[in-house]
Amino acid sequence: MTRVKRGVVARRRHKKILKQAKGYYGARSRVFRVAKQAVIKAGQYAYRDRRQRKRQFRALWITRINAASRANGLSYSRFIAGLKKSGIEIDRKVLADLAVHEKAAFAAIVDKAKAAQ
């Protein structure tokens, strides 16, 4: 039986990691051992931040809604409570978009929330 050398397999594995590390600074894109660690860490950051992105956007929407509703004379918590009582089911993403781009429409929604209280 012939001897199997692992040169081809190792080179393919190294090339794969170095390709993933393309664009990294210094040894992180050139040295296999360092590049492998950098790619693993990048994957961990990506996994974590895909979840954090959802939280951060929700926080941003709430901040925008709060600012716009206070400009119309109502705090965020009272505004959301008023929406629930009046049966308006618009999610925070859409409310934040209205607050930024359609100020008149948002003001009308705030008036409905005020009336419900």
From Swiss-Prot:
* Protein name stated in the entry: Large ribosomal subunit protein bL20
Cite a single GO MF annotation.
Answer: structural constituent of ribosome
| Keywords for the protein's UniProt record, in alphabetical order | Ribonucleoprotein, Ribosomal protein, RNA-binding, rRNA-binding
* Homology family: Belongs to the bacterial ribosomal protein bL20 family.
Q: Name one GO cellular component term.
A: ribonucleoprotein complex
Q: Name one GO biological process term.
A: translation
Q: What is the stated purpose of this protein?
A: Binds directly to 23S ribosomal RNA and is necessary for the in vitro assembly process of the 50S ribosomal subunit. It is not involved in the protein synthesizing functions of that subunit.
